[in-house]
A protein has these predicted regions:
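Divalent-cation
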Residues: 1-208
Length: 208
């Protein structure tokens, strides 16, 4: 699936530019430290890794809103819900339907048919409640259903462990153009899946 390009605004350009300048500085320092016998370059690599993660998450947060904006107006509600779920480390899996109907791809759970709200999303994913397992489906500005079962990705990562929620998010994005939000219950980290790839994003109340 080909993604439509869009113009970056000045704020995101400046943020990314700042990160890239920091990465460039760290890389230059690393080159200098190669000839220093008493310097551990692993620390430099770790700092660069963190900077790369931060710049990717910053860019992904920006792109996320643009990927969602044509399909739902409920950015604020979703942002608040995802942020609060992340803070509490409550796992979550949210499918936002876009152009393609996803009904044929999921094992349907419990019908909800209610307007999207942060409170409703957080309640559905509260640990121990009957509907907290599985995925919520959002179509336009409506929360259609909960406890849906998604197709798992057949791709197995050899570099790191991927949990069931993340495999389901990737699997769904491999088979449709849907965008899937994921909150890890182990770390609280937030990511989204699109076109078979998983992208980390920063946690904030206005991330979307």
């Amino acid at each position: 699936m080909e993604r439509q390009p869009f113009q970056l605004d000045d704020t995101i350009k400046n943020n990314v530019r700042t990160y890239l300048q920091q990465i460039s500085t760290e890389a230059s320092n690393l080159i200098k430290h190669l000839d220093t016998s008493d310097h551990c370059i692993l620390c430099d690599f770790e700092e660069m890794r963190k900077l790369f993660q931060d710049v990717q998450a910053t860019a992904a947060s920006y792109y996320l809103r643009h990927y969602l904006s044509p399909y739902t107006f409920e950015y604020a509600a979703l942002s608040l819900a995802i942020h609060n779920l992340s803070e509490k480390r409550h796992g979550a899996l949210i499918v936002i339907e876009r152009e393609q109907n996803v009904d044929p791809l999921i094992q349907k759970g419990m019908p909800i048919q209610a307007p999207v709200s942060a409170t409703l999303v957080e309640t559905l994913f509260y640990p121990g409640t009957p509907l907290h397992d599985g995925a919520v489906l959002i179509r336009n500005n409506q929360l259609i259903s909960a406890a849906n079962v998604l197709p798992l990705s057949s791709i197995i990562s050899t570099t790191k462990k991927i949990g069931t929620r993340h495999r389901a998010a990737i699997g769904m994005s491999e088979k449709s153009d849907a965008l899937i939000l994921v909150v890890s219950e182990e770390t609280g980290k937030i990511s989204f899946a699109l076109d078979g790839s998983l992208y980390p994003i920063h946690s904030s109340k206005n991330m979307i």
